[in-house]
């Protein structure tokens, strides 16, 4: 692997920093524009960067994030998540991962991606039902966003509907308007219910306008309503507090698919380089530590590398970073780092 840098203080380096910062700042509001800025950043890197030699005598820690911003790697390892909104920093392009692989490292769980489909607020949304394109319910609607987003992308092709009846829709709109939510919570919710929605006077008509199967949608609603009335257990274990009978037409299907720009379905990669759990040393294909090479954060396999749970990513990065840093710190008593420009 090689390290390339823009000449310090150059006009290209200043422009690079400006464009990269703007891409980070606008990612959540204008992702396509941010992607265009990143292309300009990569152009500067390709045409003006120069190779540098860095000699580290204790060790090297790879901690550059995952690879959600690398379309080629996503297409290769996690193609079901190509359309998701990218969550993370621009540096999450797989550079650390690829550098480790070039040194003989082994990677694992590269197909594991966490996708987040939150359907609250409004807090009453989970009282509706989430169904697939056939009209079949497939999840407990009150679960954490990553627990809902995972099967939506992995098993349902990234397509699903949130079904409400007239009463629940009215309650949801009222909450979105007057419950004191942040604008970035209330506006997408209102847009989803008012713009990205299909309406049917009956269940059969709703199925027709959405392309769902009428018998499947009716069966899903009948089973759910029975559980909401207390006549039967909920098929997916939803709590009694989150159940509400849906029987007042017209009925509405809100598009919560990955392709809906009104309600982005974010995702980040979880896999990384295999490491020794005692010190963060990167392992080769034989399970042996590669001398002087360590990894941390999403560049490495960690606690949330199979299934993300809120907070684990930050905590795991802090833990794994300290672990690797401590291992490198005690590797030798003295250290020198030599950095010099390499001729082209």
What residues fall within each predicted segment?
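Active-site and channel-lining beta-strand-loop segments
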Residues: 1, 127-140, 271-285
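Short, glycine-/Ser/Thr-/acidic-enriched flexible segments
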Residues: 4-8, 59-62, 66-68, 136-137, ...
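Glycine-rich loop(s) and the adjacent beta-strand/alpha-helix scaffold that form part
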Residues: 9-11, 15-118, 317-323
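An anion/pyrophosphate-binding glycine-rich loop and adjacent beta-alpha core
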Residues: 97, 106-212, 216
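Active-site-proximal substrate-binding core of FAD-dependent oxidoreductases
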Residues: 107-124, 326-344
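Glycine-rich phosphate/pyrophosphate-binding beta-alpha loops
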Residues: 113-120, 124, 146-149, 259, ...
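A glycine-rich dinucleotide-binding beta-alpha-beta segment and adjacent secondary-structure elements
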Residues: 216-303, 307
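Catalytic phosphate/nucleotide-handling subdomain of diverse soluble enzymes
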Residues: 284, 288-337
């Amino acid at each position: 692997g090689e390290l390339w840098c823009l000449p310090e203080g150059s006009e290209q380096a200043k422009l690079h920093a400006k464009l990269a910062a703007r891409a980070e700042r606008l990612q959540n509001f204008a992702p396509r524009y941010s992607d265009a800025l990143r292309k300009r950043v990569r152009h500067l890197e390709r045409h003006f960067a120069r190779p540098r030699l860095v000699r580290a005598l204790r060790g090297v820690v790879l901690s550059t994030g995952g690879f959600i911003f690398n379309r080629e790697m996503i297409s290769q390892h996690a193609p079901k998540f190509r359309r998701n909104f990218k969550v993370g920093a621009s540096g999450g392009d797989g550079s650390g991962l690829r550098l480790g692989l070039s040194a003989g490292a082994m990677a694992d769980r590269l197909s594991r991606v966490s996708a987040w489909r939150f359907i609250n607020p409004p807090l009453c949304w989970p009282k509706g039902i989430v169904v697939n394109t056939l009209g079949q319910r497939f999840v407990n609607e009150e679960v954490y966003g990553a627990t809902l987003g995972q099967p939506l992308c992995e098993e349902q092709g990234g397509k699903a509907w949130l079904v409400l009846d007239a009463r629940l829709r009215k309650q949801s709109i009222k909450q979105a308007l007057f419950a004191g939510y942040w604008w970035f919570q209330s506006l997408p919710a209102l847009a989803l219910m008012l713009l990205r929605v299909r309406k049917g006077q009956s269940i059969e008509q709703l199925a027709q306008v959405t392309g769902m199967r009428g018998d499947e949608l009716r069966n899903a609603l009948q089973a759910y309503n029975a559980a909401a009335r207390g006549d039967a257990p909920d098929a997916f274990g939803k709590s009694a507090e989150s159940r509400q009978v849906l029987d007042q037409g017209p009925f509405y299907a809100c598009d919560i698919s990955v392709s809906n720009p009104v309600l982005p379905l974010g995702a980040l990669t979880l896999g990384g380089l295999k490491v020794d759990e005692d010190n963060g040393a990167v392992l080769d294909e034989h399970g042996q530590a590669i001398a002087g090479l360590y990894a941390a954060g999403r560049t490495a396999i960690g606690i949330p590398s199979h299934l993300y749970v809120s907070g684990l990513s930050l905590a795991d990065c802090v833990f794994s970073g300290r672990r690797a840093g401590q291992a490198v710190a005690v590797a030798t008593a003295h250290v020198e780092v030599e950095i010099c420009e390499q001729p082209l």
